[in-house]
């Protein structure tokens, strides 16, 4: 579910009935096979787990390629390709023993080779040579890797990864990272067979070619058809096949138009689980007939947001009619008071209700980029630490609630006050009003269009259409993705405001969120803020992002005291919140579903590619014949939480055994 954690905005909706008709039912087949049928929303542009930065790829490859460790259903790190591991007492050297029964297989299930320690070395070298989008995860962590990527050293053997023998791979870090093992679930640290890689050349990991990959995971990819379907089959020779309970997985593409279809397809057996849309015309009737089966899932750690393009270069999709309007919009977005007016004037409960309905709107709301309960120290959640820092930025933050599941930002009076300050300053710069803000949206995705329309309504009502106009650009899905999610560089980011992306954490540390928009090296500055990192960007300087980077860097340099580290990251998050450069909106989960998945059997994690809160990982997943009831779910949740606490405690105690 999480490739480097860049997500296209979820909540799109259902596939056409004709598409689903081709899929088998969600129960057992005539041969007694278990089939899981679900949906997907975004086609991958490749299957290259070593270089990608997109969830569209990882949602597929994380089911077919295993790394060193994975998550169990309680979120613990358990053996995968590594049957054992150790860390040196100084925290700088991690050593993993590769299991002897780990094999590579073709897409047809034929054994190709054993998985060896050298495969992990080959994988990282390939990622470095190809300038992987996910290098940010490890480039400054592994000794010598940054120098190799920058060309300061040419010999990869000088990088801190070694195959000590066929079964042992060792990593040497620049500084201790208590969360290092959580990074091993990510594709950039996964193995690849060198002989196969060389044989495929540029055809390695093609988007629609299952034969362009080798498989060492629980499933084999059998077919992938753009805007149609993805199919997996259980790997019969997988070393841990007893924990693979679903024989086939069939995913169908959603086009986002008919929001009544998911429930219909669940009821007729076409889907094993269905995301529900309370704003659909049929939901009221569904509540009457299946009220005991409508379950709201837990909020996860993925944060969707609205980004601000502070350095827009392209204007193919725009309602602006003059260079003066373009210049005025850019000056406005560079003004913090203006951005805060947007943040405070945006009714995010109304926005979320377009997806989750009035009753469920609050269940997905989020106020911080880093979720407030993501980490804890000294008895305080991360959100509490941020609040202590945030109030020092001004009175506007004193009564703001940063907890999940409520809108702590929306305040029309604050919005008007901030806008008044901004307008006075901007008029002195010759800015023309109203400010026109282009916001692209997939015109075929009903709930996406409704959300953007809701944002337009609340902002224009609060700030006045004579001051701010949201110009909705309704485009084809591919057009929207190509100028947001899939844009190759900042020049392709053709928007002023965008809610088309989100971020999920790669590992268990606040840096996994906050590093990604550092102006010098952040991988998502173009996606969220409209400029390419690594440049001496004038707009980034204007909004103070280099000051933000200093805060993040200082936090990252604290490697001995976790409480101090988190406190420093809280200071960086407080700066980011005050800047209003990105406006968090919702989590991915916390939404109503109908399901025949046995509750809490999928692998769980708040970060990484091997744990999820959504049905995008299929190892461990178990199915039942009838729809889960609310009572069953609540009892299972209570039982799982108790078991999780006990299991996590034992896992923490067992860590001492790995220090050598």
From Swiss-Prot:
GO MF, one annotated term: peptide transmembrane transporter activity
Biological process, per Gene Ontology: peptide transport; protein transport
Keyword check for Transmembrane helix: no
Reported effect, residue 559 to A: In strain: NCTC 11906, SP-VA92, SP-496 and SP-VA96
Residue span of region Disordered: 638-660
Keywords of the record: Cell membrane, Lipoprotein, Membrane, Palmitate, Peptide transport, Protein transport, Signal, Transport
Signal peptide: 1-22
GO cellular component, one term: periplasmic space
Residues with lipid group (S-diacylglycerol cysteine): 23
Pfam families for this protein: SBP_bac_5 (PF00496)
Family the entry assigns: Belongs to the bacterial solute-binding protein 5 family.
Official protein name in the record: Oligopeptide-binding protein AliA
The organism of origin for this protein: Streptococcus pneumoniae serotype 4 (strain ATCC BAA-334 / TIGR4)
Species lineage: Bacteria, Bacillati, Bacillota, Bacilli, Lactobacillales
GN (gene name): aliA
């Amino acid at each position: 579910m999480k490739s480097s954690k860049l997500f296209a905005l979820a909540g799109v909706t259902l596939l056409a009935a004709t598409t689903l008709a081709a899929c088998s039912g969600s129960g057992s087949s005539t041969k007694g096979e278990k089939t899981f049928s679900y949906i997907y929303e975004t086609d991958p542009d490749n299957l290259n787990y070593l270089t990608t930065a997109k969830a569209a790829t990882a949602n597929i490859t994380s089911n077919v390629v295993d790394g060193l460790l994975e998550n169990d259903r309680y979120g613990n790190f358990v053996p995968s390709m590594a049957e054992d591991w150790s860390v040196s007492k100084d925290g700088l050297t991690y050593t993993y023993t590769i299991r002897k029964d780990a094999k590579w297989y073709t897409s047809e299930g034929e054994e190709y080779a054993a998985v060896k320690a050298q495969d992990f070395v080959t994988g990282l070298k390939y990622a470095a040579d190809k300038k992987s989008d996910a290098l940010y995860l490890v480039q400054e962590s592994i000794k010598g890797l940054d120098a190799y990527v920058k060309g300061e050293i040419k010999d990869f053997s000088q990088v801190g990864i070694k195959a000590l023998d066929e079964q042992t791979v060792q990593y040497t870090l620049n500084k201790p990272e208590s969360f290092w093992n959580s990074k091993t679930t990510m594709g950039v640290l996964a193995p690849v067979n060198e002989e196969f890689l060389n044989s495929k050349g540029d055809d390695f990991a093609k988007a629609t070619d299952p034969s362009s990959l080798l498989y060492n995971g629980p499933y084999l990819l059998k077919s992938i058809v753009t805007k149609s379907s993805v199919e997996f089959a259980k790997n019969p020779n997988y070393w841990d096949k007893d924990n693979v309970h679903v024989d086939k997985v069939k995913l169908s593409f959603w086009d986002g138009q008919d929001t009544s279809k998911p429930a219909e397809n669940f009821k007729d057996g076409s889907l094993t689980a269905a995301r529900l849309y309370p704003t659909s015309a049929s939901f009221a009737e569904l509540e009457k007939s299946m009220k005991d089966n409508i379950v709201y899932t837990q909020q996860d750690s993925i944060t969707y947001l609205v980004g601000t393009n502070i350095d827009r270069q392209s204007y193919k999709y725009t309602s602006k009619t003059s260079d003066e309007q373009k210049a005025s919009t850019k000056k406005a977005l560079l003004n913090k008071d203006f951005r805060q007016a947007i943040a405070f004037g945006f009714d995010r409960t109304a926005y979320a209700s377009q997806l989750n309905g009035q009753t469920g709107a609050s269940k997905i709301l989020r106020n911080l980029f880093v979720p407030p309960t993501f980490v804890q120290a000294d008895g305080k959640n991360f959100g509490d630490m941020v609040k202590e820092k945030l109030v020092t930025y001004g009175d506007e933050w004193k009564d703001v609630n940063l907890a999940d599941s409520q809108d702590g930002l929306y305040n029309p009076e604050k919005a008007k006050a901030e806008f008044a300050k901004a307008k006075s300053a901007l008029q002195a710069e010759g800015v023309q009003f109203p400010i026109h803000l282009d916001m692209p949206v997939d015109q075929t995705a009903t709930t996406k269009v409704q959300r953007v329309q809701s944002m337009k309504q609340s902002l224009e009502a609060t700030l006045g259409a004579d001051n701010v106009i949201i110009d909705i650009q309704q485009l084809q899905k591919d057009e929207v993705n190509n100028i947001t999610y899939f844009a190759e560089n900042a020049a392709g980011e053709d928007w002023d405001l965008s809610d088309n992306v989100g971020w999920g954490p790669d590992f268990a540390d606040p840096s996994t969120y906050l590093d990604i928009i550092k102006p010098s090296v952040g991988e998502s500055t173009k996606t969220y803020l409209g400029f390419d990192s690594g440049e001496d960007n004038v707009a980034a300087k204007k909004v103070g992002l280099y000051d933000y980077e200093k805060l993040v860097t200082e936090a990252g340099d604290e490697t001995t005291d976790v409480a101090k580290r988190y406190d420093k990251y809280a200071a960086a998050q407080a700066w980011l919140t005050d800047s209003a450069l990105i406006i968090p909106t919702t989590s991915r989960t916390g939404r109503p579903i109908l399901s025949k998945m046995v509750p809490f059997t999928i692998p769980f994690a708040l970060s990484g590619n091997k744990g999820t809160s959504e049905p995008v990982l299929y190892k461990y997943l178990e199915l039942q014949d009838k729809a889960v009831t609310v009572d069953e779910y609540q009892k299972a949740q209570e039982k799982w939480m108790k078991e999780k606490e006990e299991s996590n405690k034992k896992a923490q105690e067992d860590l001492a055994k790995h220090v050598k």
